[in-house]
Amino acid sequence: RKAKTANFGIIYGISVFGLAERMNVDRKEAKELIDGYFETYPSVKAYMEKSIQIAQEKGYVETIFHRKRFLPDINSRNAVVRGYAERNAINAPIQGSAADIIKVAMARIYQRFQTEGIQAKMILQVHDELNFSVPVNEKERVEEIVIEEMEHAYRMHVPLKADCGWGKNWLEAH
């Protein structure tokens, strides 16, 4: 849990103070965590700096499918306003690309269900998760289709991995 908090916080530009508060550690430990993270993953720091630079030059950043997020305040003289835009320059390509990918997966899953006469219904999408209402006799086939389409929605250097959980409600499925 702490690793996830630190990872997402650092990627999205959390301050030493913010990380210390969120993880309930002192500022020294939070600073060491952030410094250690960037030493271990220098390409993350490079990505963050490059994203900000691109936004400053173009006034926007893009997702992997080239949807643009305009950042009119990226060159603001107001540090607070600029900082918000900088965090968005880092975050928007990541979250926007994830949204692009899941939408491709959703469309392909829907098409497969239609083509194969599957009665299961996609009922909810939350971030990188899809929820379905599935007749018992379709469980195995739906799982195969969903995992296949989620994992192959977009080809990347690092393979996408998907899994399925089952239950009578959302809580049980987790």
Language model regions located:
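Conserved catalytic core of nucleotide polymerization and phosphodiester-bond processing enzymes
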Residues: 1-174
